[in-house]
Amino acid sequence: MATILRRRSLGNPWEQFANWITSTDNRFYIGWFGVLMVPTLLSATICFVVAFIAAPPVDMDGIREPISGSLLYGNNIITGAVIPSSNAIGLHFYPIWEAASMDEWLYNGGPYQLVVFHFLIGIFAYLGREWEFSYRLGLRPWICVAYSAPVAAATAVFLIYPMGQGSFSDGMSLGISGTFNFMFIFQAEHNILNHPLHMFGVAGVFGGSLFAAMHGSLVTSSLIKATSYEESQNYGYKFGQEEETYNIVAAHGYFGRLIFQYASFTNSRSLHFFLAAWPVIGIWLTSLGICVMGFNLNGFNFNASITDNQGRTIYTWADIVNRANLGIEVMHERNAHNFPLDLAGTESAPVAFAAALGDG
């Protein structure tokens, strides 16, 4: 009997490329969204690393007072950052070819726009890639929906908020201390701590942490014993096994009696949906809060909200926080805001009791 071997037709190069890109057998799934994601995230990462190490000072406020952000200009890992593009640039698109020279581009903070725009395109593509990979594997699409929460947060602080404020110099710096600086100034200008949407975000993050810790500890405490005392309990689970690895009835019984019956889930699917939805919705809402505050729909104002029978203000913690906000406003952008109107136009508000001054 004769055996005939024939080389399988692989089609044209485009088909080979398309099959490789969309193959779920690759160690690293690329996908069509990955074709966009890989170069943009690589560009953002390379520019960020180079700028963090070696970028010269940037005139962020547009008043000829450059701010140093790189390691070679005296910073460390904590203080270093990629400084936002100059207020003189505003919302203008500022690629390298728009500047008269590389020195001008660096002085005006061009690397910030390069990093941020490529990063945003990259994480949008990563979200699409999550959907694409789920689709090809026959999974439901909720992984990319969950990832949309941090994507919304990044979009809010790097794109929507600066657009609302009129300049990319108001965007968040790409560094540790720069992030804190952004938070302080945001509080001073928008009173974010008194904004309901931020409160939802706090509940989402803290609540999500609490629920994750509760769920993990309950499951770990109610594992079905499948090993001896000499082995780790983790060896009692075999990847892909059909049997449940923990006793949900025992976990429900414990938690239902620890709190009350209806605080404990009896359905594993609804439990895990809740664990995903709580932090995601919270971060969605706080991202929405950043966006609306970008257009100056600020937090609640309870300043001087309590008065005595003669109309004099009885100071509350809201007034103390307001004084801190005003102090932060005075300190940042000093040459641009020497005397904020809300400081110069009102009488001073004492923030200490008379006893603290030594009376009596």
Curated annotation (Swiss-Prot):
Keyword tags: Calcium, Cell inner membrane, Cell membrane, Chlorophyll, Chromophore, Electron transport, Herbicide resistance, Iron, Magnesium, Manganese, Membrane, Metal-binding, Oxidoreductase, Photosynthesis, Photosystem II, Transmembrane, Transmembrane helix, Transport
Catalytic reaction annotation: 2 a plastoquinone + 4 hnu + 2 H2O = 2 a plastoquinol + O2
Locations listed in the record: Cell inner membrane
UniProt record, GO biological process: photosynthetic electron transport in photosystem II; response to herbicide
Ligand binding (chlorophyll a PD1): H198
Binding site for a quinone: H215, S264, F265
Marked site: Cleavage: A344, G345
PROSITE patterns, sorted: REACTION_CENTER
UniProt site positions, description: Stabilizes free radical intermediate: H190
Miscellaneous comment as given in the Swiss-Prot or TrEMBL entry: Cyanobacteria usually contain more than 2 copies of the psbA gene.
Subunit structure: PSII is composed of 1 copy each of membrane proteins PsbA, PsbB, PsbC, PsbD, PsbE, PsbF, PsbH, PsbI, PsbJ, PsbK, PsbL, PsbM, PsbT, PsbX, Psb30/Ycf12, peripheral proteins PsbO, CyanoQ (PsbQ), PsbU, PsbV and a large number of cofactors. It forms dimeric complexes.
Name the UniProt record assigns to this protein: Photosystem II protein D1 2
Gene behind the chain: psbA2
